[in-house]
Amino acid sequence: MTQGNQKTEGNPPEQVTVTDKRRIDPETGEVRHVPPGDTPGGTAPQAATAESGGAATDKVAELTADLQRVQADFANYRKRALRDQQAAADRAKAAVVNQLLGVLDDLERARKHGDLESGPLKSVADKLESALTGLGLTAFGEEGEEFDPVLHEAVQHEGDGSKPVIGTVMRQGYKLGDQVLRHALVGVVDTVTEEGDGEAAATDEPTAAAAETRPPESDDNAGASGD
């Protein structure tokens, strides 16, 4: 034997230890549960994982809050844009209808003169008035209505103003929805209140009673008067 063989026979071979670090057991196919202390640095990775999980939760909450703010801002912007569009459409519609009020005045005068009782002009007037009514145009200002300074413009006034009502309508007013396009030109008079009627009746009754109870003139007085 050589010297090398002698050394090999004198020293027993070192045992090799193989650690199976596979998480799944190849024989059973189940996942192995290794305690944290059995693996080097097992506690530190868990702490790091917990910290990273908390940071991720905070980040998700922050992003969720940002998303909610963006959604609220967009909803407010959408409402504001729709409101502005509607206001612009209402202004444009009011401008067009306002240009046609003079035509309605001419048609009203023609109606009072009996020119719209029949014929093609009546058909045109009916179609125009129907179209404007469909857009929301309404007329106001009729005799007997209470005077409203918001809707009516008084050009003449009779009375002390205690109970003003419309006595004469010079020009009708028009509203488009809730917007006043033109005030009605009216003449205002005062109505007599019920109390005033009662006082007037009470004043007339004693006068009539006195006339009934007055004694007739005698014939002597009548003859003296004749002489």
UniProtKB/Swiss-Prot annotation:
UniProt-listed PROSITE patterns: GRPE (PS01071)
GO cellular-component term (any): cytoplasm
Biased amino acid composition, Basic and acidic residues: 19-35
Superkingdom: Bacteria
Subcellular localization: Cytoplasm
GO biological process: protein folding
Record InterPro entries: GrpE, GrpE_coiled_coil, GrpE_head
Composition-biased stretches (Low complexity): 41-50, 199-213
Assigned keywords, A-Z: Chaperone, Cytoplasm, Stress response
Gene3D superfamilies on file: 3.90.20.20, Head domain of nucleotide exchange factor GrpE
Amino acid composition bias (Polar residues), ranges on this chain: 1-18
GO molecular function terms noted in the UniProt entry: adenyl-nucleotide exchange factor activity; protein homodimerization activity; protein-folding chaperone binding; unfolded protein binding
UniProt cross-references to HAMAP family, sorted A to Z: GrpE
Function: Participates actively in the response to hyperosmotic and heat shock by preventing the aggregation of stress-denatured proteins, in association with DnaK and GrpE. It is the nucleotide exchange factor for DnaK and may function as a thermosensor. Unfolded proteins bind initially to DnaJ; upon interaction with the DnaJ-bound protein, DnaK hydrolyzes its bound ATP, resulting in the formation of a stable complex. GrpE releases ADP from DnaK; ATP binding to DnaK triggers the release of the substrate protein, thus completing the reaction cycle.
Family: Belongs to the GrpE family.
Annotated protein name in UniProt: Protein GrpE
Organism taxonomic ancestry: Bacteria, Bacillati, Actinomycetota, Actinomycetes, Mycobacteriales
